[in-house]
């Protein structure tokens, strides 16, 4: 039996007419063109653009015009100062106040350069303290450190404070006259050698100048009386009587008790101080020689350089006066009136042990 049936394949193929605006490529192109446009324009121009190619051209022209307009607005905003955004960061200073200087708002740092603290200039310009202090010393004369700290001056030989000598005399302290009398004393000359950058001659000259400056207004000015009596060619009897009545008391304090002896001449006072209150150099030298020879004779039998494991540890030798002077010279804060404090401490320590 022969069966006649149709083929499994479609033989009468008729192509369906496809619209150009509904193809996938056309839809993709439409969505790419509408990106970045306002919502209203895409809805309005959607039908017209999809219907004809002229609508697509108009849509492209509209997009270009819109982009050009946005670029013009951005350029205007950059050029105009009113449209610049303001910073919202908090400011630490008010617009009417000056800006703080570096570091930490210290306004007086550059005034006292190279000293960051204005109080350091009083100590930095001391002779020999800093190599840069010579130029500052010649520029101006610095005030007294105690006056800058608003404290009573404790230096009896202070040239900047003329009332210090009278206050020291009232309080029972050492006055400038006593310091001028002891300027030639060996102990004072020894302490003067410890001062940083100040030789003995300049220290004695400083004492003499301070004594003359402080005692010029005082009632007991014996040096001026002697100088005027020597300078006058025809001295009057009143001047001779005043010269004879002038006496030189010894103000040396021993065990909290002043000497109290009175001399008519200054040479007698100086000799008395050297003989009674100053250690004789010959006796001290002889005692040092005897002790050194005794130590040498004792140590000759032993070997001090040999290490003994069972012996006691040897204590280090006490610092000599030269080493102490070098250490004090390295300290820039040592001032002339510290001599009185050091000497008074030594006297008080000896009194306590007695």
UniProtKB/Swiss-Prot annotation:
UniProt-annotated stretches for the region Disordered: 1-23, 36-100, 218-247, 271-323
GO MF terms held by the record: zinc ion binding
Residue spans of biased composition, Polar residues class: 1-11, 81-90, 221-245, 294-305
GO biological process: nervous system development; positive regulation of transcription by RNA polymerase II
Metal-binding recorded as keyword: yes
InterPro entries: Elbow/Noc_ZnFinger, Znf_C2H2_type
Zinc finger boundaries on the chain: C2H2-type: 248-277
A single GO cellular-component term on record: nucleus
Subcellular localization(s) per the UniProt record: Nucleus
Low complexity: compositionally biased ranges: 43-54, 70-80, 278-293
Zinc-finger recorded as keyword: yes
Keywords: Developmental protein, Metal-binding, Neurogenesis, Nucleus, Transcription, Transcription regulation, Zinc, Zinc-finger
Family, similarity comment: Belongs to the Elbow/Noc family.
Entry function: Probable transcription factor that regulates development of the tail phasmid sensory organs. Involved in migration and differentiation of lateral neuroblasts. Involved in control of cell fate in the T cell lineage.
Protein name: Zinc finger protein tlp-1
């Amino acid at each position: 039996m022969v069966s006649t049936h149709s083929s499994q394949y479609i033989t009468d193929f008729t192509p369906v007419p496809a619209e150009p605006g509904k193809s996938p490529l056309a839809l993709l192109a439409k969505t790419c063109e509408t990106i970045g446009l306002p919502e209203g324009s895409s809805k309005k121009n959607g039908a017209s653009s999809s219907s004809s190619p002229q609508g697509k051209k108009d849509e492209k022209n509209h997009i270009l015009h819109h982009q050009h307009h946005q670029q013009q607005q951005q350029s205007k905003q950059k050029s105009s100062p009113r449209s610049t955004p303001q910073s919202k960061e908090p400011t630490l200073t008010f617009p009417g106040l000056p800006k703080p200087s570096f570091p930490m708002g210290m306004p007086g740092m550059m005034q006292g350069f190279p000293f960051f603290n204005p109080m350091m200039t009083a100590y930095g310009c001391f002779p020999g303290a800093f190599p840069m202090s010579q130029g500052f010393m010649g520029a101006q004369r610095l005030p007294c450190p105690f006056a800058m700290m608003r404290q009573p001056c404790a230096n009896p030989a202070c040239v900047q404070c003329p009332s210090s000598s009278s206050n020291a005399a009232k309080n029972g302290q050492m006055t400038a006259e006593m310091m001028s009398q002891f300027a030639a004393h060996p102990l004072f000359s020894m302490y003067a050698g410890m001062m940083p950058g100040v030789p003995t001659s300049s220290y004695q000259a400083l004492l003499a100048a301070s004594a003359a400056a402080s005692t010029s207004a005082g009632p007991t000015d014996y040096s001026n009386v002697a100088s005027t009596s020597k300078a006058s060619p025809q001295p009057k009897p009143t001047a001779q009587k005043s010269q004879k009545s002038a006496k030189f008391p010894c103000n040396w304090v021993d065990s909290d008790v002043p000497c109290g002896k009175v001399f008519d001449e200054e040479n007698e006072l100086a000799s008395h101080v050297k003989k009674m209150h100053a250690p004789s150099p010959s006796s001290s030298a002889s005692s040092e020689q005897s002790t050194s020879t005794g130590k040498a004779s004792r140590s000759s039998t032993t070997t001090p350089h040999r290490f003994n494991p069972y012996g006691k540890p040897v204590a280090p030798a006490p610092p000599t006066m030269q080493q102490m002077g070098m250490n004090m010279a390295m300290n820039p804060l040592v001032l002339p009136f510290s001599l009185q404090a050091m000497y008074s401490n030594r006297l008080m320590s000896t009194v306590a042990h007695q």
